[in-house]
């Protein structure tokens, strides 16, 4: 059954404002990132690689994530590594590859299906895109969680979306 939701002009305007602000954070982050020391990307992934990654992970990437994977593929700069995707990597190395990391941790530790590893804080704590918690424009929030005897536990939500998270990291690095 198809359900239609009617929005008032002000509701639609609010959603559009959220979309614009959300996307502006992403664009600003990616414009500033090359100014960071040791800025590195891998040049982007093909649509086939992105589609295969989505199928393996069981999620549809958000607009910001899809654009990031298409244009950059991966991002690192001094002390920071934003994971990329490589659905065909069979090296056994999971670090830096959201697909391999998620599939490994789902199998070994019961990682939730809607959590996609994004960033390793190197202290047993990871940042995840939480596809079970989307904002008004379909972007997943970024959560920090760790694994303990009980399983994964969310520590906090650290960003409204992918763009805000990257922008925070980039601004921190540029301030140093």
Residue positions per predicted region:
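A surface-exposed partner-binding patch
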Residues: 2-125, 173-176
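Short, amphipathic alpha-helical segments
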Residues: 109-112, 156-160
